Amino acid sequence: MTGRQRTTVVAPDRPVQDATISQLTTRVWTVAIDGYRTIVVEGETGIVAINSFGTPSAQTKYRELITQTFGDKPVVAVVASIDHLDHTGRLGPFANGAEVIGHELGQAIAFGRGLPEQKLADTVVTGPVTEIERAGVRLVLRYPAPTVGTGNLAVDLPDDDVVFMVGLQSGARYGIFPDFHFKHFLRATSEIAALGRRYFVPGRSEVMDAGQVRQALEYVNDFQNACQRCLAGGEVPHWLLEPTTAYLHDELSSKWSHLEGYDPVAVGLGGLRVVCHYYMGGWWLDDTDHHELLYDHLTVRTYREYRERLATAGTGRA
């Protein structure tokens, strides 16, 4: 008898509908493709890019925009800021030999997933703060706590007054808040916002200034609190979409219905997920007071052993 084979299902490719690249500072540009967003930095000897997008067409368009803007200047380093495939699922083809940098926790997930296109990092950082320099660009890679996904990094560019981080958005298009870790999300994201950078670049939606970041944090806080009241009040059948939608819309609409993407049904769907978060006490170690235990999980230990074998073999590259 053979064991059941596990398969990673990836999103089908689709034509790019909308793609732009625009300048934020002297050397930092933001790329937006069909609702997703990232940044690239023009260093002295090459380009430092963040993430790869998640489909072949988006990854190809990303490369085209870089070439159109910077000519034959090579991409020398790519930071994989998160484990999610829609942001980093095409690291291998996009990096094309460039150094890939990622956080140990996110890389352990990618290692366990085993998707060839999601190339593993050549340089692995760990812990809450790591400062590196590539092509004359100073990057501070910050991991304050679980926020979204696993090993989600804030890529801080202090010399450029820019920070990039997947999670927070300027509007209300959060859907079901996939893989958000509400135990730490607001505190950790607020810690990054407190850096006071001129530009806060999210992984989706529009670039935000300090005022928009404060508003975005307040919306998520109000959403979480409304979901807590929905559960704790004991009067709403919170396992059903319609009554949950009605309750949350009544709680939130007067203050937040002006947000781009606000929709009562979407609020209800997201609310079901968040209420379940509180009802069940969160998800796994990420949503506990002791999230540092993630570093001792079997997946992470196995990934470390894999890297040790690489080092012993003398390759050092994934």
Swiss-Prot record:
Induction: Constitutively expressed. This is 2,4-dinitroanisole O-demethylase subunit beta. Part of the complex DnhAB composed of the 2,4-dinitroanisole O-demethylase alpha (DnhA) and beta (DnhB) subunits. The gene is dnhB. Involved in the degradation of 2,4-dinitroanisole (DNAN), an insensitive munition ingredient used in explosive formulations as a replacement for 2,4,6-trinitrotoluene (TNT). Catalyzes the removal of the methyl group from 2,4-dinitroanisole (DNAN) to yield 2,4-dinitrophenol (2,4-DNP) and methanol. It is an enzyme of class 3 (hydrolase). Keywords: Hydrolase. Unlike other known O-demethylases, it does not require oxygen or electron donors.
